[in-house]
């Protein structure tokens, strides 16, 4: 077995820093999330996409979780403009893609269309409630979508995470250099506690390497900030993982909170990075009570192994059992819940912000120390952030 074939068969490359921008007069302003998507399309992380979705692909993705040609793709990657801006644009036009005054790309407009956002919300997020963060973002966006192939002409400033940004060509090269033929990807927007560590190490027993790929794009206000999380990942890997079996790199996309559909999307992207396997735990990419605990695992049954091209590894909720004296799940532990150390994410965040160290059966003390220090420092600067 060797590293996965890119989704769609070819790793897309839309990078051209020498693009003749002086020939392009029209502009479209990008949101932060669209800027991330632009770069991920351009570098091949979203292969086989070569641009923002046209209406045919958009409709197919929303309704069938496939592109118009049948390729598996579960999340609509779209570029939104206002009605006023849409009047300035026409099919066949080229437009600069601008963020913060800088030009990051160019789109060759192939389609201009008005989506049914309620339908998109209901099918992609399983709800049209504005309380859902993904739905709220969707309805905050302008009402017209522009589709077409892009060219990436400028890379974003990677800031403090620069050492952890890798394009798919780079991760594939690194995995090969490490001698890995099988690689399991792990997506997270949270600190890695003992339960996550347990399932990662279970997966490591059957593959050559682990690609820990935390998301550092836009998340909810109450999610633990990326800078604090990154420090916690580093201290965890330093103290508890074999250094030649783990690779840490960040994922710059925005979080959609689309649950099951986002699990498929996350798997396809990790396939492009070279992963042969992908971990799907309980309520992957979920929020609140919008999705069933294991809906993100069940959704994979809609597709054949061949069209997915990456092997999902499904794990149940794990915990420390005081009777077993170790990490376990209901698959391996016969004891009642009273013996299980389980804390909600909300409870843990509250403990950390109050300087309380969660039990070592839940979180490694080194990780807890980093999180407490980071959160308290942030609270001191922005006390209303809570």
UniProtKB/Swiss-Prot annotation:
Q: Does the keyword tRNA-binding apply?
A: no
One GO BP: sulfate assimilation
**What is its EC class?**
transferase
**InterPro entries, A to Z:** ATP-Sase_PUA-like_dom, PUA-like_sf, Rossmann-like_a/b/a_fold, SO4_adenylyltransferase_pro, Sulfurylase_cat_dom, Sulphate_adenylyltransferase
Q: What is its EC number?
A: 2.7.7.4
Keywords from the UniProt entry = ATP-binding, Nucleotide-binding, Nucleotidyltransferase, Transferase
- Domain of life the protein comes from: Bacteria
Picking any one GO molecular function of the record gives: ATP binding
**Pathway info:** Sulfur metabolism; hydrogen sulfide biosynthesis; sulfite from sulfate: step 1/3
List the Pfam families: ATP-sulfurylase (PF01747), PUA_2 (PF14306)
Nucleotide-binding among the record's keywords?
Answer: yes
- Catalytic activity line of the entry: sulfate + ATP + H(+) = adenosine 5'-phosphosulfate + diphosphate
Entry's PANTHER family? PTHR43509, SULFATE ADENYLYLTRANSFERASE
Give the similarity note: Belongs to the sulfate adenylyltransferase family.
Q: What is the name listed in the Swiss-Prot or TrEMBL entry for this protein?
A: Sulfate adenylyltransferase
Species the sequence originates in: Geobacillus thermodenitrificans (strain NG80-2)
Gene that encodes the chain: sat
